[in-house]
Amino acid sequence: MKLSQLSILFILLFIHSFVQANPLKVGSWMGNLNLQNTHELFFQFEVDPNQKITIKNGGEIVEMKDYQIENDSIKVYFTNFPNYLIFKVDPLNENKLSGYFVNPDRKKHSRIEFKAFFYDDTPVIDIRYKHENFDGKWQVTFNPNTEDQYPAIGKFEQVNNKITGTFLTETGDYRFLKGTVINNELWLTSFDGAHVFLFTAHLINDTLRGEFLSGNHWKTDWIGVRNDDFTLKDPDSLTYMVKDDFKFQFKNLNGQNYVYPNQQLKGKVVIVQILGTWCPNCLDETKFYNELYDQFHNDGLEIIGVAYESPENFEDQVERIQRYIDNKSVPYPILVGGRASKTITSKDFDMLNKVSSFPTSIFINKDGEVVKIHTGFNGPGTGEIYEEYKIETIQMINRLLIE
């Protein structure tokens, strides 16, 4: 028995020392997430000489924190979210990794099987097939022919058999997508540390028909047809006031009550941002609001965030919000709204018809009047649509400040 215990201890020490003595191989890796045991989502990541890991997610680079050794495994947290990868290096092959992507906030389907292999990052153009052209604007319906169907715009750019783009919905975009085309088949993916999205489709008689998978917990059908004239509802029209007064009270990160309106904001232009630190679209909006604040704060612009978080208790909610503020150098205050729930948020902001999206922003003039409510956020993944929105918002803030 003693010999057996010593043998086990020796093996564990050997594996632990192997992980410590053999850092991740520097260079390009191909990751693979097993979705619902039916599909695979591939993504690229890099390991630099300092062992920093960055994921290539379409048009953005997703940073990860320095990894830590946990027993015989390596655990790496995403910078912007509480999610992480935990994996082992194959002791017989340093070019292979295996483990899981974990979302600790999910009570069900919190783990997705993860594998990776080291590879030569040389672009390959597949010339074996005659590829269909998916470039352009598509009118899309998710959950078609059901009570839950909703419209979207597919916006794609294709070069040879490589494709990038996004889907815009009435509550925001699906951010940076990239993928591959083979014959009449389309694959688009996103893995940004929060979203785990896979879109597949076949082009049949000018119609796209496919599936949309989100992690291990959700799957739906979608269809699309080309339509350059198709538009979604105006995001400034979806949320509106149903009571005269816009007011609220929440606790700040120190547990003190914060009441709006207040004397300090009298005569100021104010943006109230309803968000969650778990929300990638909210992060896109926060980055833009950081720019707005830096540009216009001295002229009289104030921004107040109200965050709704996944943890149930106040202390953990504060920790999430404080980490978000620190990581992104957010210059404006963010209050604690409570649990992440559109029902709870709609009850807290009962002067609105509803809160249908994180984020939602309320724009208020110097007289304390709500002049605009913007639902959702179409971020940098939408290209010129995002740039146009930035210009429009800056022009509006300028106008409100001089009125």
What are the functions of these language-model segments?
Residues M1-S28:
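Bacterial Sec-dependent N-terminal signal peptides
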Residues V19-M30, F117-Q139, Q158, D236-V242:
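N-terminal helix-cap/turn-to-beta initiation motif at the start of protein domains
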Residues M30-D90, V124-I125, E132-T200:
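Central antiparallel beta-sheet cores of small beta-barrel/beta-sandwich binding domains
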Residues R226-N262:
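N-terminal "domain-start" segment that seeds a small globular fold
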Residues Y258-L283, Y289:
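Short active-site neighborhood of thiol/selenol oxidoreductases, capturing the structured segment around
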Residues D284-S329, S341-D348:
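Structural microenvironment flanking redox-active thiols in thiol-disulfide oxidoreductases
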Residues S329-P333, L352-I362:
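Structural micro-motif
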Residues S357-E403:
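Thiol-/selenol-based redox modules, centered on thioredoxin-like
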